[in-house]
Regions:
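Structural marker of alpha-solenoid helical repeat scaffolds
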Residues: 237, 269, 322-326, 356, ...
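Register position in tetratricopeptide repeats
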Residues: 220, 252, 309, 339, ...
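Helix-start (N-cap) detector for alpha-helical repeat units in TPR-like alpha-solenoids
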Residues: 208, 240-241, 271, 297, ...
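Outer-membrane beta-barrel translocator/receptor signature
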Residues: 573-654
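Flexible, surface-exposed loop/linker segments and immediately adjacent secondary-structure boundaries
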Residues: 17-207, 213-214
Length: 654
């Protein structure tokens, strides 16, 4: 009996410990784990499970990402020490302790179940997103809140933080609150910088070529982490070429602070220094005062990224084509070919890229997006998984994986991948917009609107969150708000010129206008809706949504009890064109459905149904039903209609 009783008493403690598991999603550089009760640090491994009491530390040029059991994501910066602590209120409350370093916290599920500690303060998380920094007991603890609410407590009191606020806890435990800087600036250390150096441009001495051989070989192969690990320790006698290579590897691995320190030691007017400054400016969307024509392959590749940040896609593609034959250069060409929707050229370029640099993660990610465009979901998922195996912090690969899983109907997995994408690169407005779409589709408008707001705050010129939020409002019959957001999306359309060529921008505007036409019609502005749909067709005649809108509009103008059915031929023509242009399974085959151009966040269902019935006091009945869907790329629709008219029927005057 005593054994049984002691066993029952232990169960809550065991359940609490097991409830707070986490796994290492990805890491780069030297990252080590210390198990609870052990004194021996061991190297980290991807997907390694950590338990309460375990510790994780990152080296000088290292990062790691943990996903907790409640789907919280911790993005841990270099030189950090983190411990997962036993719950303070088993089994609900979970805790982690940041002894030193910096982390980014993101949770969109149940953030109220987590607490954190630093040497100076504790925090109760009632928010979902913040940046936390600690410097032991001798330095300050700093917290900047992007979204939600956090209660920060010390022996001197408690401070409640709202979104956009930050707090500093000094060694004497006093708390000072202030307004935070812009959200995008708070997460600058999470930015991803492209690799641009062509090692053939380096003027290395023979002895330097030998000492850097392993690192250079890994870099040419596209393996930035291996190149970082193979770098010899810096010495005072390092030549400018050695410093340039070290700078390139550090920047591509994400350690921009160390890279900028090295950049300051290079000659300001050197070709390499200009190239690296252009890359940093491109990622931060900053302007560069002077742009002399590059004289190296590295310079042209850096110029390509900078010109894209200035919305000069043609110039960017021309610069990439002058950047040589490296895997990095061919990957860049493939990315820009995709921006012009030139899929054949993109396929040739990405094949060359992978042949030249088989371990370069962005190359596999680009090929994944190509396969996704071709609806080869198995191949796309394999490419994205390969990219993530090489670099688990690549946000584009997580996004591609999410979109692919969504197309396969694996909605929950897709949303988890989107959360990881947002955690890897929290400054990317596009990732937040996609995550908000997922919440909207799953019927969670509060979380959706929260991420839409954050996406707008990260990039006020991005039309994507306005478009998606407008469609979200339309799904919940909030059409006035939908009109407002869709109008703003149309107004901001050309701000996407950083990523889209002119032809694709026109297609984007057509999509926005077609959806805006539906919203106008829903609020009773029929004539405005017609004109907006006409503009959509003028921008892009291949926009199936605009043709579908025209078909529905003509159908409403028909009079089934009159002799004049002149709209029927035009309606059938528009419906035929819409179905020829539309992707399969969008429900457009049916003549009974209302306008079906709402974005389907994660793909159409295999089977869906719609129906209505109408009865009039004169004895007339009108009913219709439709079954439609998509199975393995095949779209279908089955319509039925039954009508009885008590003495009235079409063309009854003959």
């Amino acid at each position: 009996l005593l054994c049984l009783l002691s066993g029952f008493l232990l169960l809550p403690r065991l359940a609490a410990a097991e409830a707070f598991l986490s796994r290492i999603v990805e890491f780069s550089g030297p990252v080590e784990i210390l198990r609870a009760g052990s004194e021996q640090w061991q190297p980290a491994q991807t997907n390694l499970v950590l338990n309460a009491g375990d510790r994780l530390r990152t080296g000088v040029a290292a990062r790691a990402t943990l996903q907790l059991s409640d789907r919280s994501v911790l993005r841990i910066d270099k030189s950090s020490l983190l411990q997962l602590q036993p719950p303070s209120q088993a089994p609900a409350q979970k805790k982690f302790r940041l002894n030193s370093g910096r982390l980014f916290f993101l949770n969109r599920e149940r953030p109220s179940d987590i607490e954190f500690e630093t040497p100076l303060a504790t925090g109760a998380i009632r928010g979902t997103e913040f940046v936390l920094r600690a410097d032991g007991e001798s330095g300050p603890t700093e917290l900047a809140l992007l979204d939600g609410a956090v209660a920060l407590t010390t022996t001197q009191g408690t401070a409640e933080l709202a979104p956009g606020e930050q707090a500093a806890v000094m060694p004497d435990r006093t708390i000072t609150k202030s307004r935070a800087v812009l959200a995008a600036n708070l997460v600058q250390w999470c930015l991803s910088y492209p690799a641009v150096l062509d090692p053939g441009d380096l003027r290395l001495a023979a002895t330097e070529q030998g000492s850097l051989a392993a690192a250079v070989a890994a870099y040419r192969n596209g393996d930035i982490n291996a190149a970082l690990a193979a770098l010899p320790a810096p010495v005072a006698t390092d030549s400018a070429a050695v410093r340039e290579f070290r700078l390139a590897v550090l920047l591509a691995s994400g350690d921009v602070e160390a890279a900028e320190t090295l950049l300051g030691a290079l000659a300001a007017d050197s070709e390499m220094a200009r190239a690296f400054r252009e890359v940093i400016a491109a990622v931060k969307f900053q302007a560069v005062a002077e742009l002399p024509e590059p004289v190296s392959r590295t310079g042209w590749l850096a110029r390509s990224y900078y010109l894209q940040s200035r919305s000069d896609l043609p110039g960017s593609r021309n610069a990439a084509r002058r950047a040589g034959e490296s895997g990095l250069a061919w990957t860049r060409v493939a990315e820009l070919d995709l921006a012009f929707d030139d899929r054949r050229s993109a396929q040739l370029a990405v094949d060359r890229a992978i042949a030249a640099a088989p371990r370069y993660p962005p190359a596999h990610s680009v090929r994944g997006f190509l396969h996704l465009r071709q609806r080869d979901f198995a191949a796309a998922l394999a490419d994205f998984d390969q990219a993530l195996a090489l670099d688990g912090a690549l946000g584009d690969a997580w996004l591609g994986r999410a979109l692919t899983l969504g197309e396969q109907g694996r909605t929950e997995e897709a949303r988890q991948a989107l959360q990881l994408a947002a955690a890897m690169e929290p400054q990317r407005s596009t990732f937040r917009s996609q995550l908000a779409k997922g919440w909207s589709e799953s019927g969670d408008p509060l979380r959706a609107e929260k991420d839409f707001r954050l996406a707008k705050s990260l990039d006020g010129g991005d039309p994507t969150p306005w478009l998606y939020e407008g469609l979200h409002y339309a799904q919940f019959n909030r059409f006035n708000e939908a009109v407002r957001d869709l109008e703003q999306s149309v107004a901001l359309n050309d701000r996407r010129s950083v990523f889209r060529a002119r032809q694709l921008l026109d297609q984007d505007r057509a999509v926005r206008s077609a959806n805006l036409a539906v919203a106008y019609e829903a609020v009773g502005l029929t004539e405005v809706a017609e004109r907006t749909a006409a503009r959509a067709l003028a921008d892009d005649y291949a926009n199936f949504s605009a043709h579908l809108f025209r078909a529905r509009s003509l159908q409403r103008q028909e009079d089934p009890t009159g002799v004049n059915l002149r709209h029927e031929a035009a309606r059938q023509s528009e419906l035929l064109v819409a179905n020829l242009l539309a992707p399969p399974g969008a429900g457009n085959l049916s003549q009974q459905l209302s306008q079906q151009d709402r974005l389907r966040w994660f793909g159409p269902a295999p089977v869906a149904a719609s129906g209505f019935a109408e009865y009039r006091s004169g004895g007339d009945w009108n009913s219709a039903a439709s079954v439609f869907g998509q199975v393995d790329g095949l779209g279908y629709a089955l319509d039925s209609q039954f009508r009885t008219q008590n003495g009235d029927h079409p063309n009854g005057d003959f």
